[in-house]
Regions:
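Acidic, surface-exposed loops and disordered segments
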Residues: 2-8, 15, 19-195
Length: 195
């Protein structure tokens, strides 16, 4: 009977340890994700170190993991890694920060299908891309391309089909310098149950 009691106590202790470790593991996962979100910053200056094709693919996989209305996945991406193309676009789009970026990812939407919420869907994809870049030690910044003037420049430069509309350009590279995230927490912007 003593042996059975000891075994039962040991089994109980093992179970408690497993549950505790599992909870600790979940807590660690949450901490890692939250740390990545709070560490994300806009990087506008890059070293000459290239971004590998594998890194670009990982960024695009992260972007495509975003939610979309009715699972429509309207996003399309144009990867620009040609130095001359980047330089010519940088001249026309000075706010796109393409002058030192080794690669830029243009986030677009295909408006030929269900596209009522394309800006929401492509924005979610862009945020995933930015968070993935942060997690990978890369720098990136969201630069607008959806207004009429910038959109026309991007459409012409990249020879986009009529149904493809750019949302933003995300220059990506290895940060040149120390960039710090901004603390944007502001409880005064939060309302509960009514304004």
């Amino acid at each position: 009977m003593k042996t059975f009691t000891k075994l039962l106590a040991l089994a109980g202790l093992t179970f408690i340890t497993m549950v505790s470790c599992n909870n600790n593991s979940e807590s660690q996962k949450a901490d890692i994700v939250l740390e990545n979100i709070f560490s994300r910053k806009s990087v506008r200056k890059f070293t000459s170190e290239p971004v590998s094709d594998k890194q670009v693919e990982t960024l695009l996989k992260a972007a495509m993991a975003a939610p979309s209305a009715m699972n429509s996945q309207p996003w399309r991406f144009v990867v620009v890694n040609d130095k001359e193309k980047l330089a010519s676009m940088a001249e026309l789009l000075p706010y796109a920060r393409l002058d030192t970026a080794p690669v830029a990812i243009v986030v677009c939407a295909d408006l030929s299908g269900y596209s009522k919420f394309w800006t929401d869907d492509c924005s979610a994809a862009t945020e995933n891309l930015l968070l993935a870049a942060e997690a990978m030690g890369l720098g990136a910044v969201w630069t607008a391309a959806s207004d009429e003037e910038r959109s026309a420049i991007v459409k012409t430069a990249l020879e986009l089909p009529e149904t493809i509309h750019p949302l933003c350009i995300v220059p990506v590279g290895h940060p040149d310098g120390e960039f710090q995230p901004k603390d944007k927490w502001d409880p005064s912007k939060i309302h509960y149950n009514k304004w």
